[in-house]
Regions:
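Active-site glycine-rich loops that stabilize anionic/oxyanionic intermediates
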Residues: 42-45, 70, 128, 165, ...
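Hydrolases whose catalytic domains are alpha/beta-hydrolase-1, hotdog thioesterase
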Residues: 133-137, 145, 170
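Serine-hydrolase catalytic machinery in alpha/beta-hydrolase-like enzymes
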Residues: 2-123
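Short hydrophobic segments within beta-strands
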Residues: 39-40, 125, 162, 194
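The feature captures the conserved acid-bearing segment of alpha/beta-hydrolase catalytic domains
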Residues: 28-30, 148-252
Length: 252
């Protein structure tokens, strides 16, 4: 399944090139379909590898949708083309965020969820850059709009971020606290963050800072879990806790 226009639904008005999204992999529920979760891979990966892991989880009532990011030049890699949800340079407070790329990917994800049945609970999860995109989607949901001002169309029920960070963290609090409705949505959205203390790719401090920024912005249903000895990868204990979180928060 290919989606050929990355700016569908994002309302991009610039002349920048629209990147083509890769293949989307779907893991069908083995039991009664109660929830659909988009799962987003990390930089340079694809949806296939995560779909195989997710299929093995004891969550029979969840449908997993694992899209593949567009291949685009990535500043962090010296402009080398790579599968990436958005462009990223160094991870720092001063590095500008690629909000056009983030909006494009967030819109692609929302479009995938928007075709699900009305009674199905919806969520977004991801690893590393995928986690960053999931957290950006959480802020779009709370604000009711993408960064470019176009309306965000999906009602999210949960967010999971493994080894990631929050793009645009500096401005999230002011944006959300400026709207009663945004503050209400932020307070209602369960977010589960996990991060390894030995992560050398996205250091643990970025997970801590993201958790702090989300908490200050009013995301009250927030959990942050640290793992001793864990680098930039996942382990069964972490995925077990993801399963427990989803069962509890989605009532599966």
């Amino acid at each position: 399944m290919n989606y050929t226009n990355s700016s569908v639904g994002s309302g991009s008005r610039t002349g920048r090139r629209a990147f083509e999204f890769g293949r989307t992999y779907v893991v069908r529920p083995k039991g009664k379909h109660q929830a659909t979760i988009i799962w987003l891979h990390g930089l340079g990966d694809n949806g296939s590898s995560w779909s195989q892991l997710l299929e093995s989880l004891p969550l029979p009532n969840i449908k997993w949708i694992c899209p593949t990011a567009p291949t685009r030049p990535v500043a962090l890699l010296g402009g080398f083309p790579c599968a990436a949800w958005f462009d990223v340079g160094e991870l720092s407070e001063d590095c500008p965020d690629d909000f056009e790329g983030l909006d494009s990917s967030a819109a692609h994800i929302a479009n995938l969820l928007s075709t699900e049945p009305a009674d199905i609970k919806l969520g977004i999860g991801g690893f590393s850059m995928g986690a960053a995109t999931a957290l950006y989607s959480a802020t779009c949901f709370a604000l009711g709009k993408y960064g470019n001002g176009n309306p965000y169309p999906v009602n999210l029920m949960t967010i999971i971020g493994l080894s990631g960070w929050l793009p645009g963290a500096r401005n999230v609090r002011n944006k959300i606290q400026g709207s009663h409705e945004a503050a209400r949505r932020a307070a209602s959205l369960p977010i589960f963050l996990c991060h390894g203390l030995c992560d050398e790719v996205v250091p643990h401090k970025y997970g801590e800072r993201s958790n702090h920024a989300l908490s200050l912005a009013g995301f009250q249903n927030l959990a942050f879990k640290s793992y001793d000895g864990l680098g930039h990868y996942t382990v069964p204990k972490e995925m077990d806790e993801v399963c427990n979180w989803l069962n509890a928060r989605l009532g599966l």
